Amino acid sequence: FGTTSEGNSLSVEERVNLLETLVEGNIPPAMLMPSTGTCALTETVRLTKYAVSKGCAGVLMLPPFYYKAVDDDALFASYSEVIQQVGSSMLRIYLYNIPPISQVPISLTLIGKLLKHYPDVVVGLKDSSGNWDNTAAVLQEYPSLATFCGSEKFLLDILRHGGAGTITATANINTSNICNLFKNWKSSDAEELQEKITAIRQIFDGHALIP
């Protein structure tokens, strides 16, 4: 239930029902990372609890995004409250940084504070900032964090810098090339594979993906 799938246009009940349908359809929960971050604390907690109860590998969590210019202390308090209310040792959070949409960036300072207080819970980040310098800074500062880029244009770069990979909607239509590069990023033709991937991604970048 991420950005391209318009997850935040769905009600909590719809998101719960969709997740239940996926699990009942024999999609292994260990392969699922539903997005559970909303503007309402109670809704985020409910969605996250449900994902944990279903055995999902983790949750992708936006910060509360309606109010802008919120400082790191306030964002830390929000994430902390969710973690405490969910209250499960099985919870694994992947922070979702997408400032072009949310207008609420997840800073290096906030990441560090969350890792210090919740090292077993906050385990990863999807960086959809669209700014490679930001992604590179996260990789350098927090090498143990499972960091994903939000655009496959950076897939080879992120793998070469120790990142985890990419989480991208367009992987649904460019699956073969992206999987090939992910598996063979050390090969001699890795640059060529990346060029193919980038060319296809740029076609979509020229259009609005959300109607």
Regions found by a protein language model. Give the residues of each.
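Active-site beta->alpha loop and helix N-cap motifs at the rims of alpha/beta catalytic domains
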Residues: 1-105, 122
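Catalytic alpha/beta core domains of metabolic enzymes, predominantly
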Residues: 85-91, 99-207
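NAD(P)-dependent Rossmann-like dehydrogenase/reductase catalytic/cofactor-binding core
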Residues: 210-211
